[in-house]
Amino acid sequence: VLTIEKRGGAVMIGERREAILGMIIDYYINTGEPLGSKTLCSMLPYSISSATIRNEMALLTNMGFLEQRHTSGGRVPTKAAYRYYVDNIISSGALTEYEMMKLDEALSINASDPERLLASASELLSEVTGCAAFFSTLKDPYDCIQGIELIPAGNNKAMLVMLSLGGKIKSSVCNIACPIDDEFKSLFYKVTKEHFIGMPLSEIDLSFIQSTAPLFGAAIFDMLPILSTLCSLCQEAANGTLSISGETKLLSQSELGGSVYNLLALLAQKDKLEALLSQFARAKTGSVLMLGDENPVYELRNTAMAIQKFKYNNNQTATLGIIGSLRIDYKSILPRVDYIMKTVNQYLSEGGIRYE
């Protein structure tokens, strides 16, 4: 699951410089302020001269890990520094038993419904990280109808539920002009069992509905609202899904600056993000943490973006992840993201609802 891939070939900078770089990044993440040599000298757990600190900071600057935005100010980390920090300095933190219990409780509610599980996991990720979160499902041309349920709801209404082989559950209320008695339901289930169950979702369209009309005989006019609703549910399930949670949380991440508006526009339009996630879903990599310019999408090049891929129910593929500024609290956030991803993966591996 979200095991951060260590980037091979990175230049190791030595224990003392790692300690200095780590403290500068921690300070910047916590305060948003640059750190000067005098303050850093007082924070180190061992004695070292201010001149030595300045020399080490200058070397880290020359190596591309620090930058000085103002002549008289301290140093702040570069995008390359965050990558080195994640790969070589921080270690995976452990969640408390209480934290794990609360996350388990939140995810277990929708454990048997893959799409609702992914949606609740996305909302939970946004809540516990303070970032935007997302989930997506790929369009699967082989997904087909596994079950259909017609539930009378009174007042000439009925709830229609469609379950696909890939675990997608879609439902809608439709208006019926006649009572839904045993004869009505018997005819509906007979025709749908013989002609709809096992059909690819993408093939359930209006022309298919029209081709089945004679099978319903005189009842076709009463059946049409249900069949039209079923057609809509199948088309909805046949398409891929991209849902985003907590976009407005990005407005409070000051490190994004003016780029946040381009980022929000990207999330609203979805096209570029859908393309990126679709490309990732088809790649061999199971998880990735893209920092800064590692992201191929221009609007995401000031962000940290974690993505996890899931395979479930044979042909189904989904992604789940977060988007935040580069100044997120990696020590706190990554263990939570990792735990949620592992839990979701466990539930999906166990299999979703099956229609009997």
For the regions a protein language model found, what residue spans apply to each?
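Intrinsically disordered, acidic Ser/Thr/Pro-rich low-complexity regulatory segments
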Residues: 90, 94-356
